[in-house]
């Protein structure tokens, strides 16, 4: 079924929330939007090109006050990204925002909070509920769900005094691996959040989980966060944390298609794909195919 929405692509090539892969290198997720464009994202989605929100320069050190890497830059970038997303929503577009790492969620959530209360469907291989006190990297990309729901330094949780950007009771977390191979990611979604781990998809089936998600948001407009590390590395290894297990592309498509075809879904972001880890661009083709099938077929 083709989308009757006005789709808009807004690139958010920020790597500010990740640790450097080496002392003299930056994370390669910043190349994701360009590579997806090279593989036909705009034409396949029949979307309007709304340009790029350029991030501040990446700094390798961790902010001493917040214990978050690039904290001030993420704060400033969130303001810029929120402005651009807000304008697209005001004009009636369905924004599709390729990152970038998961810290771009702060700008998205700020844009939504300025407009009222929205839900968040958080599809991710990890819960991203770390804090500066238990994160070994200081990367906001592992803290983003905690930050947008009000836990963490006020510089990032209370931009414009709007904390929390998303109420915990309005969040559904889907696809996270548990037990988590990353022993640092000890936090599980707790009530009032809704938690649907990878095992729920595997035991109940993607159709059941997709229907449950749509039911969860039947009375609340929501945004879709999609971190492609939710996929099994057999299909998507070009991520910073390619842990064992994960969804199949078919199961993920079933859930994403159901979510974005809901009239309650107002937009989505895609994060963490790193083209520098994917020389044959298999991951890029998978992402473009998935989005095209979910939104246009």
Identify the residue ranges that each predicted region occupies.
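Conserved alpha-helical scaffold segments that buttress catalytic/binding sites
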Residues: 2-297
């Amino acid at each position: 079924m083709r989308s009757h929405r006005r789709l808009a692509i807004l690139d958010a090539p920020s790597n500010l929330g990740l640790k450097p892969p080496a002392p003299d290198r930056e994370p390669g997720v910043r190349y994701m939007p360009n590579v997806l464009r090279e593989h036909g994202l705009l034409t396949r989605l029949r979307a309007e090109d709304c340009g790029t929100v350029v991030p501040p320069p990446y700094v390798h050190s961790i902010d001493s006050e917040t214990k978050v890497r690039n904290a001030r830059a993420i704060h400033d970038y969130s303001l810029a990204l929120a402005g651009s997303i807000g304008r697209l929503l005001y004009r009636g577009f369905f924004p599709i925002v390729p990152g970038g790492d998961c810290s771009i969620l702060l700008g998205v959530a700020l844009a939504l909070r300025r407009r009222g209360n929205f839900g968040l469907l958080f599809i991710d291989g990890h819960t991203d509920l770390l804090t500066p006190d238990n994160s070994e990297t200081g990367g906001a990309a592992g803290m983003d769900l905690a930050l947008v729901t009000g836990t963490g330094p006020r510089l990032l949780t209370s931009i414009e005094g709007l904390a929390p950007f998303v109420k915990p009771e309005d969040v559904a977390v889907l696809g996270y691996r548990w037990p988590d191979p990353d022993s640092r990611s000890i936090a599980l979604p707790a009530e009032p959040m809704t938690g649907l781990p990878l095992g729920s998809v595997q035991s109940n089936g993607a159709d059941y989980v997709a229907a449950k998600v749509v039911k969860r948001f039947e009375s609340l407009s929501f945004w879709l966060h999609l971190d492609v590390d939710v996929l099994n590395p057999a299909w998507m290894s070009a991520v910073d944390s390619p842990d064992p297990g994960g969804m199949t592309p078919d199961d993920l498509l079933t859930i994403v298609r159901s979510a974005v075809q809901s009239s309650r879904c107002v937009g989505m972001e895609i994060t963490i794909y790193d083209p520098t880890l994917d020389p044959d661009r298999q991951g890029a083709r998978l992402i473009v195919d998935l989005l095209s099938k979910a939104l246009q077929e």
